[in-house]
Amino acid sequence: MTDYKEIATPSRTKEILKKHGFSFKKSLGQNFLTEPNILRKIVETAGINQQTNVVEVGPGIGALTEQLAMNAAQVVAFEIDDRLIPVLADTLSRYDNVTVVHQDVLKADLVETTNQVFQEKYPIKVVANLPYYITTPIMMHFLESSLDVAEMVVMMQKEVADRIAAKPGTKAYGSLSIAVQYFMEASVAFIVPKTVFVPQPNVDSAIIKLTRRATPAVTVTNEKEFFKLTKASFQLRRKTLWNNLTHFYGKDEQTVAWLKESLAEAEIDPSRRGETLSLEEFARLSNALEKNKPV
């Protein structure tokens, strides 16, 4: 059909919202993108083709879903808002390679759902415009699940994207940077201005590209304790590593001796700040803490 207008065009978005009497829920962080060229750029950045299976979160009225469906083998989209299920059934009716799952993605068994939907064992990529209020939990849900995700190309608040891709010694670097970079290689692909959304958010967005590492960035003896340590090291932002560690682990004699011994073994100066430590240094310290842990 030559007169077909893509979902993301401003006029078609308006038409769809009016037809279904849809009103935005602020609590769900709903902002719909109305610029097809940006959506095509997202699909291009993710390298989506007929040998790619895609998981999307929060499809909204299906603007990005449509672009994914045009290029991917199959798409499974998780939508929590029951008001959008009939909208998506309408807007995506021409695409038979899309499955909309009416569920909170954080409660979903990602492996089971994708196994049921995807007919071919193609690489899985996560491509989504993530709701601002729940960006980090959704990302960590995918990273910590046993779903084999080759790549994530997701839109989020620019500030969060900067934190994820941040390098040691920068203001944005923190436990989130480490948690993501442990599993993935991270880079900000491009910026999306706030003016291309309905309703318009208060801040600009960014597309971040995360590529799964063959093995984690560093070798740690206890992954859970490693992440606990990195979180602890940034609790008191402008304090030294020593202040943070004693604040988190305790100041009793045995704990202090354990921390001192481990820091010395890892060759890390306790007067440094957490944001100056690289992933390798955190791994060294985590392994020393694990090795010297009081019985």
Curated annotation (Swiss-Prot):
PROSITE patterns: RRNA_A_DIMETH, SAM_RNA_A_N6_MT. GO terms for cellular component: cytosol. PANTHER family: DIMETHYLADENOSINE TRANSFERASE, DIMETHYLADENOSINE TRANSFERASE-RELATED. Belongs to the class I-like SAM-binding methyltransferase superfamily. rRNA adenine N(6)-methyltransferase family. RsmA subfamily. It catalyses: adenosine(1518)/adenosine(1519) in 16S rRNA + 4 S-adenosyl-L-methionine = N(6)-dimethyladenosine(1518)/N(6)-dimethyladenosine(1519) in 16S rRNA + 4 S-adenosyl-L-homocysteine + 4 H(+). Its main location: cytoplasm. It comes from the Bacteria. It comes from Enterococcus faecalis (strain ATCC 700802 / V583). NCBIfam families: ksgA (TIGR00755). The gene is rsmA. S-adenosyl-L-methionine binds at residues 31, 33, 58, 79, 104, 129. Keywords: Cytoplasm, Methyltransferase, RNA-binding, rRNA processing, S-adenosyl-L-methionine, Transferase. CDD domains: AdoMet_MTases. It is found in: Cytoplasm. This is Ribosomal RNA small subunit methyltransferase A. One of its GO terms (molecular function) is RNA binding. Specifically dimethylates two adjacent adenosines (A1518 and A1519) in the loop of a conserved hairpin near the 3'-end of 16S rRNA in the 30S particle. May play a critical role in biogenesis of 30S subunits. Its EC number is 2.1.1.182.
